[in-house]
UniProtKB/Swiss-Prot annotation:
It comes from Synechococcus sp. (strain JA-2-3B'a(2-13)). One of its GO terms (biological process) is translation. Residues 1-24 are annotated as: Disordered. One of its GO terms (cellular component) is cytosolic large ribosomal subunit. GO terms for molecular function: structural constituent of ribosome. It comes from the Bacteria. InterPro entries: Ribosomal_bL27, Ribosomal_bL27_CS. Gene3D superfamilies: 2.40.50.100. Belongs to the bacterial ribosomal protein bL27 family. Transmembrane segments: none annotated. The gene is rpmA. Keywords: Ribonucleoprotein, Ribosomal protein. Pfam families: Ribosomal_L27. This is Large ribosomal subunit protein bL27.
Amino acid sequence: MAHKKGTGSTRNGRDSNAKRLGVKRYGGELVHPGHILVRQRGTKFHPGVNVRIGGDDTLYSVVTGIVTFERYGKWRQKVSVYPAEVAAQ
């Protein structure tokens, strides 16, 4: 007598929905206050100038300006938003 189910066991077939993480606004793009820059789990990207971090580690802009990705120490990256009139100079 078999004690294991054969092929096509009902124990298979579950998966979670994709969370749509990643960079949403790239370097050089114009953003406005509240625009989401990066959706992430943990701090792969750290908040820089004029960028805040949400409760789920989402980075978002607090001013209108241009997005820049910058090195932050040896291993880290930060995302900053510089005001458009300052970035134009």
